[in-house]
Regions:
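Surface loops at the rim/top face of extracytoplasmic beta-rich domains
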Residues: 40, 46-53, 77, 90-169
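Blade-loop segments of beta-propeller domains
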Residues: 63-88
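Surface loop/turn motifs at the tips and blade-to-blade linkers of beta-strand repeat domains
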Residues: 26-32, 68-76, 127-133
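Beta-propeller domains
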Residues: 46-68
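Bacterial N-terminal signal peptides
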Residues: 1-7
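Sec/Tat signal peptide C-region and signal peptidase I cleavage site
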Residues: 9-13
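A short helix->beta-strand "capping" segment at the edge of beta-propeller domains
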Residues: 14-32, 123
Length: 169
């Protein structure tokens, strides 16, 4: 099995492997501001930067200088640019939207965009969720073989039955 790493700045040290059949290879460097997730679109990789709301493109193994999208996100706690998935040329993003980077949250939202190979265009709101907590906001996004999009929204810090414990604790 080959694991690819995307190195962020600043580096906190080299990866340490505990499995003999894993190989770590440096794929790209220079991604700042907390990459949270990535999606593969053909031979390209779209990478989310949590704190500044940018979506960066890795094309032919090279991190492109300009972002393909820059959204206003709040980045307090675990908020920010959180999840990405693709269906054909549609790209779905999940993030905590704000009026400006680092501002107060307007909501946790899912948007769809069209990917033209260069930039993300035609932004459409798909789902508007609550944004009451700065932690436990989820972020994982996947698609099934039929093109349906699934999203982990987290428990927003609301413990109890959400944890699937019979006694609610």
């Amino acid at each position: 099995m080959i694991l690819f790493t995307i190195l962020i700045v600043p580096a906190y040290g080299e990866p340490v492997l505990k499995e003999d059949d894993f190989v770590v290879q440096k794929f790209v460097s220079g991604i700042a501001n907390g990459p949270t997730s990535m999606a593969f679109e053909g031979k390209d990789i779209l990478v989310l930067q949590k704190t500044d709301g940018e979506v960066r493109l890795i094309h032919n193994g090279v991190l492109q200088e300009k972002p393909v999208l820059d959204e206003n996100v709040t980045s307090e706690g675990e908020q920010g640019m959180l999840g990405i998935t693709t269906v054909g040329t549609k790209v779905y993003l999940y993030f905590t939207e704000s009026t400006h980077d680092g501002g107060k949250p307007l909501g946790k939202r899912v948007y769809s965009y069209d990917w033209n190979g260069t930039v993300l265009t035609d932004k459409k709101l798909i789902k508007d969720l609550w944004a009451t907590q700065i932690y436990h906001n989820g972020g994982a996004m996947v698609t099934d073989l039929n093109g349906s999009v699934y999203l982990v929204v987290g428990d927003a810090g609301r413990y109890g039955k959400l944890q699937n414990h019979p006694d609610g604790e």
